[in-house]
Amino acid sequence: MNKNLRFTQMMIGISTMALSFGSIQTQVSAEETAPYNILQMKPMGTETSKDEIVHATKADETLNFEERLKIGDFSQRPTLVMKRDEIQLKQSYTLAELNKMPNSELIDTLSKISWNQITDLFQFNQDTKAFYQNKERMNVIINELGQRGRTFTKENSKGIETFVEVLRSAFYVGYYNNELSYLKERSFHDKCLPALKAIAKNRNFTLGTAEQDRVVTAYGKLIGNASSDTETVQYAVNVLKHYNDNLSTYVSDYAKGQAVYEIVKGIDYDIQSYLQDTNKQPNETMWYGKIDNFINEVNRIALVGNITNENSWLINNGIYYAGRLGKFHSNPNKGLEVITQAMNLYPRLSGAYFVAVEQMKTNYGGKDYSGNAVDLQKIREEGKQQYLPKTYTFDDGSIVFKTGDKVTEEKIKRLYWAAKEVKAQYHRVIGNDKALEPGNADDVLTIVIYNNPDEYQLNRQLYGYETNNGGIYIEEKGTFFTYERTPKQSIYSLEELFRHEFTHYLQGRYEVPGLFGSGEMYQNERLTWFQEGNAEFFAGSTRTNNVVPRKSMISGLSSDPASRYTVKQTLFSKYGSWDFYKYSFALQSYLYNHQFETFDKLQDLIRANDVKNYDSYRESLSNNTQLNAEYQAYMQQLIDNQDKYNVPKVTNDYLIQHAPKPLAEVKNEIVDVANIKDAKITKYESQFFNTFTVEGKYTGGTSKGESEDWKAMSKQVNQTLEQLSQKGWSGYKTVTAYFVNYRVNAANQFEYDIVFHGVATEEKEKTTTIVNMNGPYSGIVNEEIQFHSDGTKSENGKVISYLWNFGDGTTSTEANPTHVYGEKGTYTVELTVKDSRGKESKEQTKVTVKQDPQTSESYEEEKVLPFNTLVKGNLITPDQTDVYTFNVTDPKEVDISVVNEQNIGMTWVLYHESDMQNYVACGEDEGNVIKGKFAAKPGKYYLNVYKFDDKNGEYSLLVK
């Protein structure tokens, strides 16, 4: 029976690298041709670095959010806190070499080597086919695994990890290739059950030494690729219990966390696969009611309590798997009960909270244990407002950044200008700047950047995409997701990764027809080597020095010439062995610098969607011994001179304040220096500055052929940029340029269309629109709140439309609307106004909605509040509100601050005795401090400190 769920085999090249280890490059399992993407329940393979930017899967590109939730695995891997040492392996083996050995020699060899000494695990070729077609040999390996399971010790794992990886590779390759169809059958997977049980019955099967942890990890991984039964699941209970009982010690131990993760993931994966393959319900399976102890230990993980940086991944997994496995408990509502407890236990909008809500939506009909409906869409929108509150627009809205509040404006500006450097070099090389399919979502490029790796984990909940990576681009949405990082969190800077991913955007829009993963050109990973190496190559783009090799790429090339990729290996690389990124970069860098006509032809064939001739040309290049020799020599040259290279990044010239300069003058100077004809200038508006493009036609000298003409043109454009930079205006140091549409005229002269882009600093027309929302507001559930836009005006036109977004999914186009909220809480209200020139301006304010109005009885328990004295209080259900009073005798400024000790949903509002319906001040959140100042007039004031969710917490209050 196949572990094949809803989808036919997807493009393997569309990977979402499956491992999240604190952004540190770590290899902890055997390599595969396509890293396991949990969004499709295909066989599990290898795990990779979180540093890398990845492409989406076909599921990511085609399914809606709810469908992705149903088929996805949004578990979270433990975080590695130490960078591994590089291991230099003494000898490598191919499966062809292993296949020539008699069984006794094979077993002896496998017992002495590491799995990563076998170079072609998880790859399908004639050699791997021959190795895995031998059923007798497979049985020998399985039986030997059982023998070693009985005899491993605390100090010696007996090579169990290597035997397991060889078997996992078999099941993985068998899944994708009909020639090995017997390896797809569950009946054959079940042959591993005796070996698994032999391992588990060994008294050393527990968390402990590094060797023991390694065996436990292998046990979980093999179950995920092979199969389980109730007995193998029960054997795992003691491992989980041991981990839970020693959580305070083990939570910081990566190896033990990894072992527990693989155990739970592997068992869940096998059980969920069985449901899909058989179309059975949980209560119709062997596991129903027979694995309660295992589920109970998972539930313990879900309800650990206090979330820390060390245990957040663990808690999230506990909730996730408690929801999925709960239906197999003898009490089928146990899972719903646990995730409801988790939802109420953890902070609202935290990762744990989102995992609980998603499990309710995905597995329990969108209701909690008490039958209350949860509105996932509303919660998701609240999460986006909290984690991605900032929006920046560029180029008339064609580039949009949505970011966390700690991503600096300077970083956004740098990324914008980095995109322009990459774009200029990219269009030069491909010779085209027209979208292949205008009207797609990528007409507007959206870049979503979270504050840090931890908050990036929320992207799974907010947008529904994998986060075990350094970032992911979804072409179907025209959106790129990533996060800000520190040098300790990633070996690459955000700008470096952004340049890589921006190249993928350019590829999809200007070079490769069709959406990512669709069409014949994408099949069989034809473009894997090209697109990833191409992105690494163009990440080295500069403003005036073409595209240069990046030191970070060169350092990834092997120091051993015999270990470097050949041209053939590079051209036929597939996802799985991530070294190919570096080697494909090196090959494309070589072609760019020394065989541009070859580089150009490859791209022409791809853009023309000429699959037949692309295949033929790639095959021809792969067998070109001269090309391979020159490629090897080029890599050696890079390695020998790597200290001379760096990692290109935008200079501070882009960020300085440039003097105003009329655009007409800019155009004339560019036309004069560049010697172009038929020039036109276009201005574009961005949030921080405006930009321009100058387009024209350049006529060169006598044509010497396209390749030589291109080189001459590139040199000429670089010289033009340098000449412009020597002029007095600093804005010329922001100018990039590219040329497209090569042709030769009747006089045998080459011609190009040329485009310059840079900052525009002419004096701006005053276009300010003042949006006045007259907030913040407060009100009562189910009672009208009056909103006002008085004071809103346009300085250079008149306001012609209003759009209020009340933050609860409803809107109004009135200037001064009323609105009724159905639920208590704090809402963000946004007002968008448009003036007679079509310009839009926005502003936001807060509205606090309480459950019950304050009556005169509410103040019977008022507490007198002294000035300049710290007061402690708490809000514990059913106590929703604390009321304090203080008197002001003379006009003065009063400063109120409340420290929200447990970060519950709480705030404060202040009333004057003369008007108990309209407050005079309210708190604004600054971290966990709720602050406010106001000019007080004499009289008595009532300070209401209240909570608006079900959490309990303490606070400290100071009025001065």
Swiss-Prot record:
SMART domains in the cross-refs: PKD (SM00089)
Main subcellular location of this protein, as a coarse class: secreted
Substrates-to-products reaction catalysed: Digestion of native collagen in the triple helical region at Xaa-|-Gly bonds. With synthetic peptides, a preference is shown for Gly at P3 and P1', Pro and Ala at P2 and P2', and hydroxyproline, Ala or Arg at P3'
Gene3D superfamilies (UniProt xref): 1.10.390.20, 2.60.120.380, 3.30.980.50, Collagenase ColT, N-terminal domain, Immunoglobulins
Segments of this protein annotated with the region Disordered: 836-859
Segments of skewed composition (Basic and acidic residues): 836-845
Active site: E501
Cofactors that this protein relies on: Ca(2+); Zn(2+)
Source organism of the structure: Bacillus cereus (strain ATCC 14579 / DSM 31 / CCUG 7414 / JCM 2152 / NBRC 15305 / NCIMB 9373 / NCTC 2599 / NRRL B-3711)
Induction cue: Expression is under control of the plcR regulon.
Descriptive protein name: Collagenase ColA
